[in-house]
Amino acid sequence: RVCYAIPLPIC
């Protein structure tokens, strides 16, 4: 999966 950090890191 792809991890996003907007605003917290969520994978």
Curated annotation (Swiss-Prot):
Record keywords: Amphibian defense peptide, Antibiotic, Antimicrobial, Disulfide bond, Fungicide, Secreted
Tissue expression notes: Expressed by the skin glands.
Compartments in which it is found: Secreted
Statement: the UniProt record of this protein carries the keyword Secreted: yes
SS bond partners: C3-C11
GO (cellular component) term, any one: extracellular region
GO BP annotations, alphabetical order: defense response to bacterium; defense response to fungus; killing of cells of another organism
Signal peptide: none
Function: Antibacterial activity against B.subtilis, E.coli, S.aureus, M.luteus and P.putida. Antifungal activity against S.cerevisiae.
Protein name as annotated: Tigerinin-4
Species annotation: Hoplobatrachus tigerinus
